[in-house]
Amino acid sequence: MQRDTFAVTVNGKLPGNLARKMTSYEIGDDFAKAAKYIDLDKASVEVTIDGKDSTDRFDIHKEGTKVWASAKKSLLDTTYNTAADRAVRMTVEGAYLKGVLKAGEKVTMTNGGWEKWNDQEIPSNEPPVKEWSPNPDKSWIRLENGKWEAVIDPSESNKTGADTMKFLDGDQVGSVVNGTIANDLAKVNDITLTDDYANADYLFDLTGDRSRIRVYEADAATDAKSSVADIINTGRDVTDRFDITVNGTKVTAKAHADYLAEQVGLKNPKQITLFLPGTVDFADGKGAAQVRKDFNKAAGDELTFCENPDGSKLANSGSEKVNDETQPTNEPYICGYVPPVKKKVIAEGSQGGANQDANDKVVYPGQRVEYRLTTKPQLPADLAYDVVHVRDTDTYDQYLIPDKQTLEITDLATGTPLVTADPPMGVEGDYTAAWDDESHELTIAYSDKYVQEHWTKGSHPQVQVRFEGTVSEDAPTTVKVGNQWALTLNGSVTPSNIVENNPPKHDPSKKDTQSSAQGDPTVTIDGKTMLLGDTGNYTVTLDLKQKDNAYRVWRAGITDDYDEQYVSILPSDIEVLDQSGEDVTGRFNVQVRDGVAYVYAKTVDTFVPKTGRTIPGDPQPEDLAAYASASGHDPLNEPAIDQTLLGQEYQVVMPYKVVKVTDGYTVRNKAVQVTNDTKAETNE
């Protein structure tokens, strides 16, 4: 293995019974034929004579690819007429060079030596030795017929198994690191497989059950690359012979010592595979809505993403370490898919609407709206799993009363309405619908047959769900009426955008001021004492600032029930001023009857989009008391007020005269603003 250490020995002898002492003696190693792969350390040379360390009796040399020991004179002087040969052994340590072999490469090299007596040099034998480098690879994998379909990627194509496939949120996905063990290793002191999914953490969530992380082995055809494709189902589970460690996004499997010992001198190569099961978990659990935000998409948009928000691939890396050598794997990636899920609230035709978008528009209690749920996904051809379950869940507001019989589902590709299942009548249908009044939810489950025919990989299903509902008469004017739906594909839940309707908001007020005849109309006389014959002004602020309505405002005005025993008001004196101070009394109907002043916007010619007819605004209501107290409105047959009046406040000025006084009596006055069927009282 690269970076492994080793030692080489050269054996020789000092011959006995020589007629004269030797003039020189050398013993050495020449690694010229292996110099590309190894290096020897001069400082490590040790020489023994008959097993006894005699290094100090030699000079040590290194030149190029040669390392040798030459006898000193003191040793040479002992070589004359010895009784027997003396065994000489030179040992030198070395190391396999790093970065020389390619991953999976195995080479055979030889190493020579020599011994030299005076001028006679004798070469040694050249024993061969092999060097090998591991070659791991990795892939994303998926379930197939309920079993994990383990794969290999020996060419490191990043296109095997589930690599590059599109996953839905909640899908199951796994990762494998495939390593090999050579069959002719001389020593094995470490085998470690590592998987690091840091770059895929935005999408991938490792199983919380660490016992599901497994290691498998199988006899292999080669040690140059992975070769056992279905090792999870056909291999041997050896997880108990490894220590599994999870540190953040890094998972390591480190072999036990007894397992390492068994890998020396194997009969056949082995493949070992680390398996990590997990789940697709969009945006670290924050779901499709957060993914859309992270990629600057609008709520409800369709999105396929193979990168993190920072642009890096949703890739996974790994490595295999054998002894001191670590080789990295390839880095395959996977992708996520978010289907389009659109929601609209529509101005409904029976309310005089033109089916226009009514999102964020004002809707009054008692008015109807139409909701449309639309999805038109371009399903990827390489979805990791078939779509087998499709469900719509609409969560409507607690203050919406749905008109359940208006539910319709249409295949927009053909314009054909889908058929509701009715088993008692023998109608199989394309879907079933369930309304949960307590949870305010509508759930639509599509039939298996419909899903199989219309939601296949690579298809373009187009479905619209619509239903109508009425805003409750009890809806508070401080709460928006909202709606959202979610599309469920298999186990993936994708929310739509949220649509909302604003409640009507009107804040009328009233003040009591001096009359211009007796003083300054800007000076309040609220709470002051008045004398018989004194005059003043009741001024009511008619609040029509809110103008972004889903439907036409059909009634707007004020009703002021004043104390007619003590003050008198003439209808001819009443005037209405806009925010610029202009007199717009002519756009209002004014009546005073039985101590009550009525000031209401006139009805005008009103176009009804759905019928194409214009309803005349005249004649105006003859009895404003009856008009002001009437409930309900028929938008298709009754006129509305002039919508250009909306968007500002009006001052309704009602001059009065004191016609009776009683010592200590307080004259009180409060007005009511009526807008459509809503009422808002002023201060008193």
Whereabouts are the PLM-identified features?
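Long, low-complexity, polar and repeat-rich extracellular regions
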Residues: 19-22, 86, 116-117, 184-188, ...
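One face of beta-strands
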Residues: 12, 43-45, 111-115, 179, ...
